[in-house]
Amino acid sequence: MQDFLALTLQGEQPATREGKQANFSWRWLGEGLLECTPHAQYDKAVVLSAGVHGNETAPIELLSHLCTDLFAGRLKLAVRLLLVLGNPYAMRQGKRYVHDDVNRMFCGGYKNLPVTEESKRAEVLEQTVATFFQESSSQAKRYHYDLHTAIRASLLPTFALFPYQTHGYDADLTASLEAADLDALVYHNALGKTFTHFTSENFKAASATLELGKALPFGQNDLSQFASIDEVIRNVVSEQALPVRNKPKIRVFQVSDSLIKKDEEFHMNLSAEAPNFSTFTKGEIIATQPSGNYVVEQDQVWILFPNPNVKIGLRAGLVLTETI
């Protein structure tokens, strides 16, 4: 098996599309899609994805190195694994996305958009993940880690978002995120169209979207900054004990509301460079628009992913409260 990332960036296929290593079999399922199944019995089926946004390169490089180490025998595979490089079309252009945000296309969202390379890719990803979980052992617990980096600074630099779900959240997933020295966990309050919403809603996978720092071009990342999450995902796929947390207790937030842009004249009382987890207190106005202002009713709230430039009708930010 040649270099997984290089093949994907070059739009090429490996010389052979399947093969066997010392302790696992593998299949190239298509561009940026690699399935690995251990010869021994397994009790977890894990999806590791990166590059759903094409310019978020550090997680892509982490998965590439993990893949290289699996094939070199430096890392032993103990779970059934699907490696996903989400948006090769945007990766090759160094862009977050080319036409539309792929991470808003899942749960059938692509059906409401014009047919593009990216909408077709979202459909392929849904089909590939569905087949992967359906062909895995019925006894295997299902997991999905979707790795991202942020386009803005953050007062809490690394955090994970859990999709809204009516079934309970998986303790092993939460433990792995705590061990990865993430600063915060955020629980969604409504269904969405993200990759992790898709895997959680449709396959009851224990899923999380991880935000791991700043987006930089390929080759410019200091991967030592991602050592904690790298160690954890390697321990997950090899079923080794998780490392001990080295940071203070992880903070936990709940999404309480979404800021919806209803009018063209929409203004947020934040600077363009305001970091994630900027705060507002009771009585302060977060956003103004002719149809009505958003005034804080709680003692304190935090703002995540503020973006006043979205299209009318879309979410311009998430409002969070902290769970004590």
UniProtKB/Swiss-Prot annotation:
Q: Which reaction does it catalyse?
A: N-succinyl-L-glutamate + H2O = L-glutamate + succinate
The protein's enzyme class: hydrolase
The UniProt note on the cofactor reads as follows: Binds 1 zinc ion per subunit.
Residues bound to Zn(2+) are 53, 56, 148
Give the Enzyme Commission number. 3.5.1.96
**Which pathway is it part of?**
Amino-acid degradation; L-arginine degradation via AST pathway; L-glutamate and succinate from L-arginine: step 5/5
Q: Name one GO molecular function term.
A: succinylglutamate desuccinylase activity
Q: What are the entry keywords?
A: Arginine metabolism, Hydrolase, Metal-binding, Zinc
Q: Which domain of life is it from?
A: Bacteria
- Give the GO terms filed under biological process for this record: arginine catabolic process to glutamate; arginine catabolic process to succinate
Q: Active-site positions, per UniProt?
A: 211
Which cofactors? Zn(2+)
- Listed InterPro entries: AspA/AstE_fam, AstE_AspA_cat, Aste_AspA_hybrid_dom, SuccinylGlu_desuccinylase
Family that this chain belongs to? Belongs to the AspA/AstE family. Succinylglutamate desuccinylase subfamily.
What does this chain do?
Answer: Transforms N(2)-succinylglutamate into succinate and glutamate.
What NCBIfam families has UniProt attached to this entry?
Answer: arg_catab_astE (TIGR03242), PRK05324.1 (NF003706)
Q: What is this protein called?
A: Succinylglutamate desuccinylase
Query: The organism's lineage?
Result: Bacteria, Pseudomonadati, Pseudomonadota, Gammaproteobacteria, Moraxellales
This protein's gene is called astE
